[in-house]
UniProtKB/Swiss-Prot annotation:
It comes from the Bacteria. InterPro entries: FAD/NAD-bd_sf, MnmG-rel, MnmG-rel_CS, MnmG_N, TrmFO. It comes from Methylorubrum extorquens (strain PA1). One of its GO terms (biological process) is tRNA wobble uridine modification. This is Methylenetetrahydrofolate--tRNA-(uracil-5-)-methyltransferase TrmFO. Keywords: Cytoplasm, FAD, Flavoprotein, Methyltransferase, NAD, NADP, Transferase, tRNA processing. It is an enzyme of class 2 (transferase).
Amino acid sequence: MTNPIHIVGGGLAGSEAAWQVAQGGRTVVLHEMRPVRATDAHHTDGLAELVCSNSFRSDDANGNAVGLLHQEMRSLDSLIMRTADAHQVPAGGALAVDREGFSRAVTAALEDHPNITILREEVAGLPPEDWGSTILATGPLTSPALAEAVGTLTGRESLAFFDAIAPIVHRDSIDMGKAWFQSRYDKAGPGGTGADYLNCPMDREQYEAFVAALIAGEKTAFKEWEASTPYFDGCLPIEVMAERGPETLRHGPMKPVGLTNPHNPTVKAYAIVQLRQDNALGTLFNMVGFQTKLRHAEQVRVFRTIPGLENAEFARLGGLHRNTYLDSPRLLDATLRLKARPQLRFAGQITGCEGYVESAAVGLMAGRYALAEAEGQTLAPLPPTTALGALIGHITGGHVEATEEAERNAPRSFQPMNVNFGLFPPLAQMPRNETGKRLRGPEKAALKKRALTDRARADLAAWMTGERLPHAAE
């Protein structure tokens, strides 16, 4: 008799991983601590409970990265997507679900599966080694005992208990007629060139108006279970810094020293907003020190007053909330195994993905990796041109190593991320219209997204059939 694959955590990632393994013919033991031990966020003991929104976001597979991820997961027999489709409620172009019906259906599917045993018990420490292959999908509200055990194994600094998220901007939406590349004092850090940061200058009037807008902007209240979590020094929301005094920001993350504006070299900026490359492709830049609790609409409004960001498109908006996640690029291998103990895989939000769909997607791949390993097989690497491949690539190696300057302004270089087109390799050629003319504006953006999604579909189909990737040379 073969050993079962153990999965700890019955959320979206754990449920999807269990389904993938069981559908592949292997037995699964799924450990879920609810209702034996409750969390501050969950309200039921159902599997795959949606604790916040009931939305899986856009279902547009041609123009939206998460919609493409929906499509890819459906093609790989995703239980989460199948159940979401069956319990869909009207939500325009988004896929939203009846959350209670959704959770009940996922629970029933797993309870009824002949290859799955569900144990309602807390795994209070690291799983015993005689369990063999195990997937930890314990989410951002991992129980304290298990978080402590993982921290001990990996190094306590490898777990973050308060998640500071700064906005991330698409590089091609920044106005380079106002912004410029330069590191402070032209310092070339490890792997740098001395021109590693994008800089957006402000005069005094612009700065004072910006500070006033930050303070006046509508904030998102902490959830009840977050309110008692203290700030860490590197995680202060930018609006909290602004409230400490009108000059605080220009002596902190917006200090103008060591930088010269080549567009206006004789005038010294009063304050400067810096953006740091966020992914290895150089398509995404994060706003240094701009973690915030401003509501999303307020972030867009206020941050677009920054010179150079008037037309900024955001891959992710900022936030600050209690979370638990691994420094995955340092700790996990390409198949989501813990380097320090390869019997353990991680899946879901604890790996550093953001969002319901992304969590389930990582669970899907963790399940498939574990299944292949149990069968003595090796899955071919996911094409990075696919939504799944781009997401797994970000988690296991798509970050930028932190420089000394970056470490002073952020808790780490790797931070949670939703799937977005900034994680995808650029197209070999930008799309043109029927006459061969280069496009601009909304038409260009729409055709670019369609080209990215068409490429992804072709490459995933080739990966699924083992054929040579048609876009492998790009």
